[in-house]
Amino acid sequence: MVSLCIKDNNTKIQDFLMKKIGESNIPDIYYSKHIFKLYENVIIHYKGKDFQKFYKFLSNLLSDAIINYYEPTIVKRLILKDYFYFDALDRNSIYNEYNILHHNSKKYINKDILDYIENHKSIVLNGFVNFRLSNYKNSLEPLVESAVSKFVLDKEYLEFVSLLRGYVDSKIPEPIKIHLIYSNKESILLDENYNMLEFEDFNSEYLSDISFSQNDYALNTLIGKLPESIYIHLISPKDEYIETLELIFGKRI
């Protein structure tokens, strides 16, 4: 028989462990919860013979517990430590961006836990996270950096759209109609008689070294002409560019 005592005082973690152990399909597992001195303990006994399967189950279980209940705090501390100059609302937005990112932090935890529980009869979960999972915590830092980059780009994008929307709303529209044909992420502009319109150039010496896409020129032309109505004809599905036009020109579309 092999046994493991999992020590942690987080009630949610205790309940999570008890629930998942109870749902396991591994025979010959016996478990209970007791309070001894400083910690609440989940005690697991295994009387079977497939030790590899048992330890693999435990390492997966503890990895899930760490990701679900410890990782949010670790990530928020990383954001606060490295990006303290953002206010609380922005830091929360960065954390939300982090949660959207696809990542597999579990692979950085499993082996360390497996190596430990195969050689120890008890594990203090909080101490293990704080002192034995450096590879795992290091793996979170580039993900936080990616979340910050995404947040900054999104914020700049919203500020850009807001600026253009303010400019468009401040101008009296011209009594013309323009059709925009959108296909394969490229735009074609037609006047109300369906004649092709030439794109207006970016008239600034400071932008001479920047490479603009066809859609950039189309947007610049629409802003320059300020039509009262824009008809969008989608050959390809709507994407972020079309959504940007809708945000900038509003009811004119």
Predicted regions and their residues:
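Conserved mixed alpha/beta catalytic, RNA-binding, or beta-rich assembly cores of soluble enzyme
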Residues: 1-216
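C-terminal structured domains
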Residues: 193-253
